[in-house]
Amino acid sequence: MKIVLANPRGFCAGVDRAISIVERALELYEAPIYVRHEVVHNRFVVEGLKQRGAIFVEELHEVPDDNIVIFSAHGVSQAVRKEAKERALTVFDATCPLVTKVHMEVARASKKNIEVVLIGHAGHPEVEGTMGQYASDSAGMYLVETPDDVIKLNVKDPSNLHYVSQTTLSVDETADVIDELRRVFPEIQGPRKDDICYATQNRQDAVRDMASQVDVMIVVGSKNSSNSNRLRELSEKLGTTSYLIDCPEDLKEEWLTEQTKVGVTAGASAPEELVNQIIEQVKAFGGTAVEELTGREENMFFEVPKELQIKTVS
C-alpha cells in the first residue's frame, strides 16, 4: 500500500506565528500565560502548550487581574479588546494578519455606514471576532453560510453593501455564495483580493490534485478546525472516501483494507510531527513506499510582536 503525501500541507504562516507568540511569552515571562480560546485549533498543539504553562480560557473574566493574555489566531471582537484594556491586562495579539485584513475591511465599512455581509460558519471564533468589528448603529452586519441564506437577507440599502468572508472556508462553496450575492444584490462590493487565505487555497488545491490518485484520504486535523474539515469535505465531494483524524490512535485499520494508495494531508493547524506519527501508523497497517507530491511553494512569514523579539525582559 503506497502512501501519497499532499504538498503543501500542515502549518501555515499564521499558525506558526501564533504558536511562536505563546512559546516566546512562556520563555520571557513566568507561567502561567493565559490564552483566550485555543490559540490554534489543534489538540496536539494545545496540549503541548498546556504542559509548558499556558492556560486556555474562553472568556476574559477567567483571566486574573495583572496577568498576560494572548488572543488566539482567530481574532477577537472590539468588545473583547475594550474589556482587556479596561482591566489593564497585558495583551499579546496572535490574530493571523490575514484575519486582521478582514477585520480592517469591516471596520472601514462600518465607519462609512456601509452594510456588510460576512460569509462564514456561525459559532466559529473567527466569525465572532469579525462580526464584532462592526460598530455602526445606522447600518448592519449579516452572516450567511449558503446561497439559500442570501435569498433570505433583508438589508437596509442594497446599493450600499459590501461582503467579506471567513478565511478558512471552502473555495468552491464561497464562490457559490458570492455568485448568489451578486445576483441578488447587483451593486454589492467585495474585497480587492479574495479573503480566503493563501494556505487554505493551496491545501484545497493540493487535495483537488491528489484525490483522484488515491483510494482513501486521511486528513490530519482536529474536529474543530474549519480548514481541516473543508479538506475532508472537498475530498469526499471529489469521490474519495475521506477521514479526519486528530492522532494516530484515531486511524482504523479497516479503512485501509484492500486499498492500494492512501493519501495523507494536514490542515493548516496540524504540525508535521503529528503527520509523521500518522504515517508511521499507516505503515504499521501495511503502508510501504511514501511518495510526496510536488506542490505550490510557500514562503510566507509573519513576525511576532516586537515585545516578544527581545532577548530579555527589562
From Swiss-Prot:
InterPro entries linked to this entry: LytB/IspH
Active site positions, chain numbering: 126 (proton donor)
Residues reported in the UniProt entry to bind [4Fe-4S] cluster: 12, 96, 197
A Pfam short name: LYTB
EC number: 1.17.7.4
Protein name, entry field: 4-hydroxy-3-methylbut-2-enyl diphosphate reductase
Cofactor: [4Fe-4S] cluster
GO terms for MF: 4 iron, 4 sulfur cluster binding; 4-hydroxy-3-methylbut-2-enyl diphosphate reductase activity; metal ion binding
Lineage per the UniProt record: Bacteria, Pseudomonadati, Pseudomonadota, Gammaproteobacteria, Vibrionales
Residues annotated to bind dimethylallyl diphosphate: 41, 74, 124, 225-227, 269
Biological function: Catalyzes the conversion of 1-hydroxy-2-methyl-2-(E)-butenyl 4-diphosphate (HMBPP) into a mixture of isopentenyl diphosphate (IPP) and dimethylallyl diphosphate (DMAPP). Acts in the terminal step of the DOXP/MEP pathway for isoprenoid precursor biosynthesis.
Keyword Iron-sulfur listed: yes
Residues binding (2E)-4-hydroxy-3-methylbut-2-enyl diphosphate: 41, 74, 124, 167, 225-227, 269
Record-stated family: Belongs to the IspH family.
Keyword Glycoprotein: no
Cofactor comment: Binds 1 [4Fe-4S] cluster per subunit.
Keyword annotations: 4Fe-4S, Iron, Iron-sulfur, Isoprene biosynthesis, Metal-binding, Oxidoreductase
UniProt pathway: Isoprenoid biosynthesis; dimethylallyl diphosphate biosynthesis; dimethylallyl diphosphate from (2E)-4-hydroxy-3-methylbutenyl diphosphate: step 1/1; Isoprenoid biosynthesis; isopentenyl diphosphate biosynthesis via DXP pathway; isopentenyl diphosphate from 1-deoxy-D-xylulose 5-phosphate: step 6/6
